[in-house]
């Protein structure tokens, strides 16, 4: 970042962290407060030092709460250090801060981050503050461990050694004396710390819930929420009544209804928040777990947070494959060979189609040479023996809910996995499949057939699966196989499945898009890719801030199925890399297996050492808590879901998603876009103060927070202190200052703050404003830049943050001030001078208010664009004439157009002579990937979508991680993008893809790319992934979303293949009167017909992925004439059926305007849609319903005339273009922003 002297000055109203007065950029950059709170210009690196200096001055106001928490934090750290010998590290610091702030929250984090230690030390610290604690653990062994740890801590702390807390505890198997002491302590309520199992809590909830306490720590919340009974026990312990729960149920129902209607939900959050605050006023609740497979919506709403899951998609697994031998004994021998060389710590997964008998035979065969055990629901205790090293290798089923697949988290023990075949779903036609497969196949059938009954039943089945536990799903699947199923929805689902799978056409379509293989025995095989990810992921876990290295070896029993597995894995893992294992050479590609195993063993030994010594401090030192701020909630939700199912904190109206990235605990939240804008108060020149300094002008923009009223009007400044200036309501539903205050508190918790707003000038300005607002609270703030919302791009942005680009900020500042000055100046003239005169001329309308019209506006770019529309309409009117037309009966799709002339009228007959037909083949394309202007143009031309609507859709697709950044004028495609095209074509065409694949970068290097898909998924596959629930998006997609995605995908794929071959026929014609004596004049001397489009080298239907901007492909005219028994020359008599008015000049469409702005260089990717939207919204232009042509209104014509006659030189096309070029030079650091603003300032002073 540049020096302070080069930073553009600004004033932020109501933004001093301490007093809420105005504060300058300079003071915020120092990490300080306003000069009223502190006179000295001093830089601060942390908020603690800042608070101390303010307190010395006796001026501490709003920062008192943070001071209290920081003081308590120091006391807590002192206790922590004395107990453990080292201070808290990484996420523990954030947990402590949140606890001391009185926040209830969930800790969902992998082993080794000190969750239990934190809970125990918290109870001791709170005892020192006179507060009682209840700690709940899932098993008696964990209760005993907690008691032992707590006892040793108490002995190590001098100030409580003589007066220790009274600790009572319960677990099965206690001695009679211990039980008696615990009963007495619980009945008399004289304990300080109470520890019990979850089971005891449920059985004795009435007695325990009557006890007053201040801290509840629930370890292994997954167990605590295992049943509704245990969830109810926790709710009762927290003090929530059945009435509270009924209110929450009703509120959640309202929330769902409002969301579907797109109505406001803020008041619902307020109602829930009120209940929560009433019940938890004096309590802090912390849920802790390594995993979470279930949650309770009532409980999560009441406590104000939603636990997540550490089902981590961050993995460091070497994925290898080798062909599985055909014979069973040869397979067993191969596995033995692998085990001898890999050693202990292995998991062997057997696909479910091989049945339990296969597992028994495999166990028996291996037991002769290795210490192995097969795991089932009845032998799960053997996992403990494996964890302790008494068993070397475990064998289990490769099924999504298998014990080894989901119930194992042993990073110190598990080193590798072997899959004896591809995990799969296998069934025969007519067989009762398991519920997960049933749901997937119904989704496919619904997508293909559009049968409303199937769609309805499919959704009901999905809902059931989401609600049911793994055990319940297994039970229902067994009932279905045994013919004992009674559930009417599921029975209907199976009937529909069998009905459609017996239809060969449906079966064929399913096989085309549904990713399954039909085996020689007519079995349907579907790769179970989620099971592969989960099972292989057991070998690569997070422990104490590190992701362990793992090895996965897949014995491939079907290479077609392997191809489908890999395709599916690419959807959820950005860059999985398969290496073929050479067992004899003991290598896989460039990997020496011996070296890899050595590395894995070293890691496991280090983890075991950390675990046994209980000292994870060195490892935790590198674990950081990172706050990532983006603009939109959708983007925040999408990003957080890349790494696990995140836990959710609800703070006011803001959601904070928390997830784990190995050495980082990531908090992701959204600012809601811009948080500041220029004030509309009477300050300076339209919100910009101007000072003279050393004979130069200094421009100081004055910013205020952004507000929104209940009617969704956006503004910065109230009218009469509390009213929306547009509609005068006093109900304000949003003020960005509230969001800023939440972000400030989060910044105190974090070790690092990253701001990941959009990668353009607007995004940089949002990031800059947030940086300044947060700087006093955290000095470690940087910019995270990414051009696509994918796991890989986000990780790169987080791990390689950059400094803020002040030149981009300056450029945006110039754009905004120029827009404000010229806009406010000319708009006020239109509203107060032009309107009264224009209004009076509309004498027929007496209802109009002719004093002032606030809806009128003018702008630097807006006005030239309006001029184009008006001028084009004038030319259109001048060149209008009538055109007649008729169809050739024998060739219905050929229409003949005839200009108005003597002898041509409706119902008259003419003769069309076909003189010659020439057939030719032309190349089409490839066209480059979309830029903003070409996307807006095609979207308007193909679908009639407006520019603003297309930009909203593209923004959604970007934020949901489906396309790259959409505000771009670059065609460049990165190597990552090229690989997306290659992977897709390889999947669709197999080895033939090389016949058409021709990678192109379309430009030199740089950060920006053309608009492209982020994954090798066409629109049909996208619909299927969403319908199956395999791709869960933060927002529901509409048909228009799919349409826009489809053309983006096609245009991109076409940019990476050879040109299309387009077959055409050119028919030369002449027109005559009915008697064939008089020749008729016509502009139509030829008929051009496209008869085919192909890609040489493949025989696959190209319409699935190729960009073909041709709506109709017709049958050959020559062939049709031959069928009619005609030869060239030949003639047809036609009747003129109708006519219409046509001009030789076409009116503009929105697509045309975008291209015009691009070509004339007076627009930007970020402004095209806004400019067109403003012109339409002001009523200057109307858009025709059918043809989507833009027609100026009388108001638009008069506004254009008035502006050009009186202020033409300020809003001319040439002046606008030159000013935009200057702004680009500011962005590139080639022009001083002050000089550009000086020019604009001098200009507006000339406007009278």
Swiss-Prot record:
Enzyme Commission no: 5.6.2.-
Record keyword tRNA-binding present: no
The record's function comment reads: Modifies the topological state of DNA by introducing positive supercoils in an ATP-dependent process. Increases the linking number in steps of +1. Has a DNA-stimulated ATPase activity; closed circular ssDNA stimulates ATPase much better than dsDNA although negative supercoiled, positive supercoiled and relaxed dsDNA all stimulate ATPase activity. All NTPs permit topoisomerization (relaxation) of negatively supercoiled dsDNA without nucleotide hydrolysis. It transiently cleaves a single DNA strand and remains covalently bound to the 5' DNA end. Acts via a tyrosine residue.
Q: Which residues bind Zn(2+) 1?
A: 16, 19, 34, 37
Q: What is a single cellular component term in the Gene Ontology annotation?
A: cytoplasm
* Family from the record: In the N-terminal section; belongs to the DEAD box helicase family. DDVD subfamily. In the C-terminal section; belongs to the type IA topoisomerase family.
Zinc finger RG N-terminal-type: from-to: 7-44
Stated name of the protein: Reverse gyrase 1
């Amino acid at each position: 970042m540049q020096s302070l002297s080069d930073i553009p000055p600004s004033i932020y109203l109501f933004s001093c962290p301490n007093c809420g007065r105005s504060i300058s950029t300079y003071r915020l950059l120092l990490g300080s407060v306003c000069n009223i709170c502190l006179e000295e210009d001093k830089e601060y690196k942390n908020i603690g030092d800042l608070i101390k200096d303010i307190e010395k001055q006796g001026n501490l106001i709003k920062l008192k709460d943070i001071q209290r928490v920081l003081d308590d934090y120091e006391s807590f750290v002192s206790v922590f250090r004395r107990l453990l010998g080292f201070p808290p590290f990484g996420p523990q610091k954030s947990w402590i801060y949140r606890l001391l702030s009185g926040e209830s929250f969930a800790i969902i984090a992998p082993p080794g981050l000190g969750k239990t230690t934190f809970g125990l030390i918290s109870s001791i610290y709170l005892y020192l503050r006179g507060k009682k604690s209840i700690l709940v653990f899932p098993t008696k062994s964990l209760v005993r461990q907690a008691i032992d740890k707590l006892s040793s801590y108490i002995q190590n702390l001098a100030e409580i050694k003589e007066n220790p807390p009274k600790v009572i505890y319960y677990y099965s198997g206690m001695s009679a004396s211990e039980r008696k002491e615990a009963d007495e302590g619980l009945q008399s309520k004289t304990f300080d710390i109470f520890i019990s199992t979850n089971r005891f809590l449920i059985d004795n909830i009435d007695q325990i819930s009557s006890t007053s306490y201040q801290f509840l720590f629930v370890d292994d919340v997954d167990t605590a929420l295992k049943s509704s009974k245990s969830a109810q026990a926790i709710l009762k312990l927290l003090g929530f009544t059945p009435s509270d729960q009924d209110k929450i149920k009703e509120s959640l129902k309202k929330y769902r209804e409002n969301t579907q209607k797109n109505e406001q939900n803020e008041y619902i959050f307020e109602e829930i928040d009120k209940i929560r605050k009433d019940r938890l006023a004096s309590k802090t609740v912390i849920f802790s777990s390594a995993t979470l497979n279930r949650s309770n919506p009532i409980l999560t709403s009441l406590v104000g947070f939603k636990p997540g899951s550490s089902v981590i998609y961050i993995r460091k697994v070497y994925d290898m494959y080798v062909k599985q031998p055909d014979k069973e004994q040869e397979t067993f021998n191969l596995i033995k060979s692998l085990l001898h060389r890999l050693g202990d710590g292995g998991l062997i997964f057997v696909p479910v189609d091989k049945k339990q008998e296969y597992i028994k035979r495999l166990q028996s065969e291996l037991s002769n040479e290795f210490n192995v055990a097969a795991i089932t629901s009845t032998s799960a205790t053997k996992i403990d023996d494996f964890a302790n090293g008494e068993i070397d290798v475990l064998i289990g089923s490769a099924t999504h809910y298998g014990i080894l697949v989901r119930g194992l988290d042993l990073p110190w023990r598990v080193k590798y996995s072997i899959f004896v075949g591809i995990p799969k779903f296998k069934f025969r036609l007519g067989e009762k499949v398991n519920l997960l497969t049933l749901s997937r196949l119904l989704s496919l059938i619904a997508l293909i057939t559009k049968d409303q009954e199937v769609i309805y039943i499919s959704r009901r089945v999905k809902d059931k699966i989401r609600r049911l536990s793994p055990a319940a799903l297994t039970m229902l699947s067994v009932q279905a196989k045994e013919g004992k199923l009674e559930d009417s929805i599921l029975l209907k689902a199976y009937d529909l499945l069998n009905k459609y799978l017996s239809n060969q056409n449906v079966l064929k379509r399913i096989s085309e898009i549904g990713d399954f293989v039909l085996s020689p025995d007519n079995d349907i095989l579907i790769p179970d890719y989620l099971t592969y990810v989960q099972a292989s992921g057991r070998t690569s876990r997070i422990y104490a801030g590190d992701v362990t290295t793992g090895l996965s070896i897949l014995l491939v029993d079907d290479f077609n199925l392997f191809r489908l597995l890999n395709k599916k894995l690419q959807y959820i893992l950005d860059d999985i890399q398969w290496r073929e294992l050479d067992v004899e050479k003991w290598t896989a590609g460039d990997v020496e297996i011996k070296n890899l195993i050595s590395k894995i063993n070293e890691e496991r030994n280090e983890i075991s050492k950390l675990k046994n010594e209980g000292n994870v401090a060195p490892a935790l030192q590198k674990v950081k808590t990172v706050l990532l701020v983006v603009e939109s909630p959708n983007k925040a939700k999408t990003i957080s879901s890349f790494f696990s199912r995140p836990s959710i904190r609800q703070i006011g109206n803001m959601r904070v998603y928390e997830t784990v990235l190995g050495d980082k605990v990531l908090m992701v939240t959204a600012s809601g876009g811009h948080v500041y804008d220029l004030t509309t108060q009477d300050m300076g020149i339209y919100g910009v103060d101007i000072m003279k300094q050393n004979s130069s002008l200094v421009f100081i923009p004055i910013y205020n927070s952004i507000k929104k009223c209940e009617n969704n009007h956006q503004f910065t400044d109230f009218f009469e202190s509390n009213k929306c200036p547009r509609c005068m309501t006093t109900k304000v539903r949003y003020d960005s200052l509230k969001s800023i205050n939440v972000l400030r508190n989060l910044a105190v918790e974090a070790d690092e703050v990253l701001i990941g707003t959009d990668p353009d000038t607007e995004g940089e300005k949002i990031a800059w404003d947030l940086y300044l607002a947060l700087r006093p609270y955290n000095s470690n703030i940087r910019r995270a830049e990414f051009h696509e919302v994918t796991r890989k791009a986000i990780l790169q942005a987080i791990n390689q943050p950059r400094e803020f680009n002040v030149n981009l900020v300056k450029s945006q500042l110039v754009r905004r001030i120029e827009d404000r000055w010229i806009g406010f100046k000319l708009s006020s003239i239109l509203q107060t001078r032009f309107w009264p005169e224009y209004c009076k001329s509309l004498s027929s309308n007496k209802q109009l208010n002719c004093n002032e019209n606030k809806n009128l506006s003018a702008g630097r770019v807006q006005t030239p664009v309006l001029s184009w529309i008006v001028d084009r309409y004038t030319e259109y009117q001048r060149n209008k004439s009538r055109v007649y037309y008729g169809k050739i009966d024998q060739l219905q799709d050929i229409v003949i157009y005839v200009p108005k002339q003597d002898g041509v009228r409706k119902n008259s007959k003419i003769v069309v002579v076909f003189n010659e037909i020439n057939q030719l083949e032309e190349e089409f394309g490839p066209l480059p990937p979309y830029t903003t202007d070409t996307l807006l143009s095609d979207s308007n031309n193909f679908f009639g979508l407006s520019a603003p609507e297309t930009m909203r859709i593209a923004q959604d697709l970007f934020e949901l991680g489906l396309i790259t950044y959409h505000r771009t004028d670059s065609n460049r495609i990165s190597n990552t993008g090229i690989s997306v095209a290659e992977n897709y074509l390889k999947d669709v065409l197999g080895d033939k893809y090389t016949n058409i694949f021709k990678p192109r970068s379309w430009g030199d290097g740089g950060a920006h790319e053309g608009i492209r898909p982020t994954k090798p998924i066409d629109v049909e596959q996208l619909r299927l992934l969403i319908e199956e629930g395999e791709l869960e998006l933060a927002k529901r997609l509409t048909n228009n979303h799919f349409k826009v995605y489809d053309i983006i995908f096609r245009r991109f794929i076409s940019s990476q293949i050879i040109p299309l071959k387009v077959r055409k026929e050119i028919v030369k014609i002449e027109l005559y009167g009915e008697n064939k004596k008089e020749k008729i004049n016509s502009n139509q001397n030829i008929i051009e017909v496209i008869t085919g489009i192909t890609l040489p080298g493949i025989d696959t239907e190209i319409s699935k992925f190729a960009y073909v901007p041709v709506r109709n492909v017709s049958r050959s005219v020559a062939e049709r004439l031959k069928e009619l028994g005609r030869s060239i020359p030949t003639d047809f008599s036609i009747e003129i059926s109708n006519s219409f008015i046509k001009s030789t000049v076409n009116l503009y469409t929105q697509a045309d305007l975008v291209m015009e702005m691009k070509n004339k260089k007076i627009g930007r990717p970020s402004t095209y849609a806004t400019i067109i939207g403003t012109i339409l919204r002001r009523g200057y232009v109307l858009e025709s319903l059918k043809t989507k042509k833009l027609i100026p209104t009388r108001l638009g014509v008069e506004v254009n005339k008035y502006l050009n006659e009186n202020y033409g030189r300020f809003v001319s096309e040439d002046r606008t273009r030159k000013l935009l070029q200057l702004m680009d030079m500011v962005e590139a650091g080639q022009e001083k922003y002050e000089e550009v603003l000086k020019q604009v300032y001098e200009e507006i002073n000339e406007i009278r």
